[in-house]
Amino acid sequence: GKVETAITAWKNLLTSLKAQENSTPLIKLSQVLIELWQPSPQLSSEPGSLIAKNLQGWFRYRTLKQLYQVQKNQPQLSILQQQEQAIAQEAIYKLLLIGTLPVLGGIVGVGLFLFLLVQFFVRGDRALLSINKTLAWETPWNVETIWQVLIAGFFFVGQVALPLLFSFVGYNAANLNLRGQAIYVLVSYVSMAISGLLILYLSLKPFFPLPKDWFKFKPLSNWILWGIGGYLVALPLVLVVSLINQEFWDGQGGSNPLLFLALKAQDTFVLTIFFITASVAAPIFEEIMFRGFLLPSLTRYMPLWGAIVASSFVFAFAHLSLSEILPLTTLGMVLGFVYTRSRNLLASMLLHSLWNSGTLVSLFLLGSGAG
């Protein structure tokens, strides 16, 4: 490897650390790293615990290996190699699990989608894939109310009001540990959801009682089948669109900061908070806003298929990641189709929850092998 380049980088880091307060452990670690790769290392103390505490993954293994080789500590070197072999085997099992389950689900999804296509060509308007082009919700409000709910209830509250409020009270999430950041994510999202739903309620209150079929929750219907079936079909569709999308963005996709935190988290409490946020709170709030309110409202101005596409695009745009608009629009279209066919928000909420849960589980399994 480029040892000289690495040593130069560590020396530069050491210089900058000496100018900072509360950086003593990192200063000691930098000194150890520089000394370990010298031709004749002179270690003033036993740095094993310092390395184990401050380095992770491959960096910890490589540094400890160098330390034990310098010390000629063959017993510890053998133990380290055995540990790394066990970690490597565990990582292989996890990668197989992460890769196999979505592939199996995708295969089932492709089969289900092909079956639905054949049924559509054979049965026509009686098929599950058929969309009643004349279907429209009775919508007493106009486009001004639609924009009011979206702009004020979703974008303004989430992107302007809440950040300003947290900044005003001096709350900086960057200074928190992982548990603190997890709680911050949950509190900020739930606050946005409650505020958004309150604005939705106040905006629609003048039109009470609402016409039939608005915001339907039917727990005794077949919503579970619609949710699971929609999830299986979404897997291959979103995967194909994502692969195409990669070509446009040269692999430089956006990223939800929640996913990055979840990748680092190996704390049950933190993961539980992330699960509540992504797999419970987000599906409930976003399905009420985008499938429960926006999609039906748009049927006043366009056919049902147009409302599904338009609401899906707004849903994707609301995630504020330009490079992920195509995959998220595809997911939104599946969510919209499931909702319009089932006429039950529980179905799209289940699909949404399964999607987010699958992402979190994959990141947890990947992150658990990083230590």
Regions found by a protein language model. Give the residues of each.
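Alpha-helical membrane-inserting segments
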Residues: F113, A161-G170, S195-S203, V233, ...
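Juxtamembrane helix-loop-helix connectors linking adjacent transmembrane helices
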Residues: I131, L164-Y189, L202-A281, G369-G371
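Hydrophobic alpha-helical transmembrane segments
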Residues: Q148, L186, I224-I228, T272-I276, ...
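Hydrophobic core segments of transmembrane alpha-helices in multi-pass, intramembrane catalytic enzymes
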Residues: M192-G196, F274-T277, L328-L335
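Active-site His/Glu-centered metal-binding helix of metallohydrolases
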Residues: I284-M289, F293-L294, S321, L354-G358
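Membrane-interface helix/loop boundary segments of multi-pass membrane proteins
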Residues: I288-A307, T340-N344
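Functionally important transmembrane alpha-helices
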Residues: W305-G371
